[in-house]
Amino acid sequence: AAQRELTKIRNEFGAFSDIILFFSDTKNFRKKIMPEYKGHRNRKKPCGYKRVINQLKTEYEVIIMPELEADDSMGVYATQNPGNIIVSPDKDMKQIPGELYNLNERFTITKEEGAAWHLSQCLSGDQTDGYGGVPGIGVKRAEALFNKEGYSWKTVLKAFKDKGLTEEDALVNARLARILTVDDYDFKKQEARLWSPSSSYRVNYGARSKDESTRG
């Protein structure tokens, strides 16, 4: 099954395209932020999982980074080595600037679009991964709010506080939602750098942000 999917990808990009495969480490830095993260997924890997990876290693370059999920490893690699194409159907990868192929279409994501999508996911949460965002806010409502108020950390905090939640709740959701880039990883310590926005963090994206720039 894995080889079938890889053959499809080769056919999409040409037989001479190099394919690098990314897999999640057995440890996950997000569990340090929220121990119950993906708690409902604590089932063992399928029988033969390691054997499949070991077989793929004989034919492809395989990358597994300490304490990172595959999405994070792709994000770090893609931003460290611009010009590559991320292949993933996961909506989380819309945070990473560069080219993305979601198995249906290819499109280019700007740094501003990626940063804006991260903030939207912070508000909407991801029930599959076990963090809820702001109750009652989904992706469409989050985007409508940001287009009205501006894509900023201030807007995020207000949305959380309006529902009786705290700044700490907002930060936990933002850190869980964020897919790492090369700037979010300490290669010497081999660990994630947790996202820490300034109070003035704002993204140059959306109806209220045309003349503003992305700041950390």
Q: Where are the model-predicted features located?
A:
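Domain-level signal for Mg2+-assisted phosphodiester chemistry and nucleotide/NA-binding surfaces
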Residues: 1-55
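Extended two-metal-dependent nuclease catalytic cores across DNA- and RNA-processing enzymes
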Residues: 16, 39-215
